Design a protein with these regions (language model features):
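Short, acidic (Asp/Glu-rich) active-site segment that either coordinates a divalent metal cofactor
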Residues: 115-121, 134-167
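A short glycine-rich, hydrophobically flanked beta-strand micro-motif that places a catalytic Asp/Glu
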Residues: 68-78
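Residue-level signal for inorganic ion chemistry
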Residues: 31, 55, 77, 147, ...
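Short beta-strand segments
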Residues: 6-8, 32-34, 73, 107-109, ...
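Conserved RNA-binding domains used in RNP assembly and mRNA/RNA metabolism
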Residues: 220-280
Length: 280
């Protein structure tokens, strides 16, 4: 639990939907973290958003004074947005991304245990206190892959809507892989522990974890178009549960047009104003 493998460079990086990329030596943080969260398996889908929040909290202080702020983007990205809107927004709009630029991506891969945690008798708070290590040993593992653009130049970035901390004006001392990894590990450990304390429900207890997840998510409150396995769905993004909740959804499976609320479990999100996603 919380062990990590960090690569100095990647030549065949793999993302969601089998997207691939390369990273130059020392240009990015590319790390895989093993987690064995003691939560019901049905709540593991919160992990990409939790990992994204850990990345956002790692990057936000580094961006201070640059004119950019870090936010998560459902389902598995971290982006930066300008703190002040430019005079001519159309000049910097990126198709499907608007004014935002992608600085990090996350991929979570489940490795099921022989005995799932919900069958171990230790998923509740009392069970965790009485046998946390046993419960963790029996829990499914999740490999959380995280890539953060740190020091790449513009020509080294894979797509026009990507950015690196160096390119955003972050001081080089704050883009050192080891320092970023240490801060990321601390935030991730704290968030996973808080999530476990709530039995995998971010809205449990005082609801603070759920509020933090939503406040960090740039997707919420936006009119979006989502490319899903069932087709395009348009609507206003109003919540994460952890699927993306759209209001006044149009599209998707037959019979869902005009649904007051429609929950999407997987898909690529773009601004409805700018059109369909071009990939991640």
């Amino acid at each position: 639990h919380l062990s990590a493998l960090c690569a100095q460079t990647q030549t065949a990086g793999r993302g969601r939907a089998e997207h691939t990329w390369v990273t130059p030596p020392h240009g990015a943080l590319t790390v895989s973290v093993v987690l064995r969260p003691v939560v019901p398996a049905a709540r593991l889908d919160w992990l990409p958003l939790l990992a994204g929040l850990a990345v956002q909290r790692t990057l936000e202080p580094r961006l201070e004074g640059t004119g950019w702020r870090a936010r998560t983007k459902w389902p598995n990205d971290v982006v930066v947005l300008p703190t002040d809107a430019p005079a001519d927004a159309s000049a910097v709009d990126a198709p499907g991304w608007g004014l935002s630029r992608k600085v990090a991506g996350i991929l979570c891969e489940l490795i099921p245990a022989s005995e799932r945690i919900e069958n171990s008798g230790a998923a509740g708070p009392a069970g965790r206190r009485g046998g946390l290590e046993r419960a963790r040993a029996e829990a499914s593992a999740v490999i959380v892959g995280i890539g953060v653009n740190l020091a790449q130049g513009a020509a080294e970035l894979p797509v026009p809507w990507a950015a690196s901390l160096a390119g955003l004006g972050v001081d080089s001392e704050l883009t050192v892989v080891r320092g970023v990894l240490e801060d990321l590990g601390r935030h991730l450990a704290e968030l996973v522990a808080s999530w476990e304390d709530r039995d995998g429900d971010p809205d449990g207890g005082d609801g603070e974890l759920g509020r933090c997840l939503r406040e960090a998510c740039s997707t919420l409150g936006q009119d979006v178009v989502v490319t899903t396995p069932a087709g395009l769905v348009r609507g206003r993004a109003i919540d994460v549960r952890p699927g993306l909740v759209l209001r006044d959804a149009v599209g998707g499976p037959a019979g869902e047009d005009g649904a007051e609320e429609f929950v999407i479990s997987a898909g690529d999100v773009a601004s409805a104003r700018l059109g369909t996603p071009t990939g991640t």
